[in-house]
Amino acid sequence: MELGLFTCGYQYTSIESAFIDAAAFGYDFIELWGGRPHAWAPDMDAGRVAQLRELSARYAMPIRVYTPEHNGYPYNYMLGDEGQWEDCMRYLARSMEVSSRLGASRTLISVGHGGHTEPAQRRAR
């Protein structure tokens, strides 16, 4: 069994501290939370990706999973009008691009809460 450190709990510290702890405590990999300030997909330009890959190499701690922030505001794949859903799909595509550029083998997606919409409407999406 392998264990990964999910970096969401480090959102109020430097991302490097997550890599330091993962290495110090014997974790096998990083699950990188894709939220601000560390790795929000729209912020992930080539320079930011390079910084994170450098931390991964420095601490011998691979980024195997990228988990974009999508469990609440501003993205919910299950609610909103067509324009909001299309925006969510663009964000999802960008998140998967970021995951690939980071060298992660997985992107963890949570579809969010369907609210109280009609079941047929949810299935149609």
Question: Which residues fall in each region the model found?
Answer:
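N-terminal amphipathic alpha-helix/helix-capping segment at the start of soluble metabolic enzymes
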Residues: M1-G4, S56
